[in-house]
Amino acid sequence: MLNSFSNAGIFLIQSIFDLYIFILLLRVVLQWVNTDSHNPLFILVARLTNPPLRPICRMIPSLHGIDFAAILLLLGLEMLKIAFLVWLQVNTTPHFIGLIVLAFSELLNQLINIFFYAVIALTILSWVSPLAHGPLVEILVRVSEPLIKPIRGILPSISGLDFSPLILLSLIHISEPTRPY
């Protein structure tokens, strides 16, 4: 039985892991969509993720714009987080295959969330300040546009209203994996 002190510790550990995994996954997404390397937000993400990635990048190079070192680190951190939390909560270690499946599921869910919230933020921003531009807007456009563009090709604007973000958000919501726990 876990007491409230243990629950607070578990929450803190999970939050720290989740925050760093999110930043690292954001780095992978920003590299994938070819974000400008001079963007201040990209520079911040790169500075936060470079220290553990440098030694791994020497062994595992990027290929076709995909940072395999970051993906390997993501998978390792997610597996470590899950194993550590399972060990703290039920005092056992999970099966390795189950750990890999859960880690992939969690990473896929977080990746989908990045796209989902980027589209929502860009949509709200287009209502509030349609002519806004800046480092954050550039990133939101770069992350959202590869997903919205094919839908715009199928469903053009109707009377000046663009329904493609709504369609995309519905598709993202439908495709979101269910958690096994």
Regions found by a protein language model. Give the residues of each.
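Hydrophobic alpha-helical transmembrane segments
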Residues: F5-V28, L63-I71, N109-F116, F163-I167
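Alpha-helical transmembrane segments of helical membrane proteins, especially in multi-pass transport
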Residues: L108-H133, E138, S144-E145, P165-L168
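Alpha-helical transmembrane segments of polytopic integral membrane proteins
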Residues: F22-L26, T35, K81, Y117-A121, ...
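Single conserved hydrophobic/aromatic residue that forms the stacking wall/gate
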Residues: H173-Y181
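Membrane-interfacial helix-loop-helix connectors in multipass membrane proteins
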Residues: V86-S105
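Alpha-helical membrane-inserting segments
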Residues: L25, I56, G76, L80-L88, ...
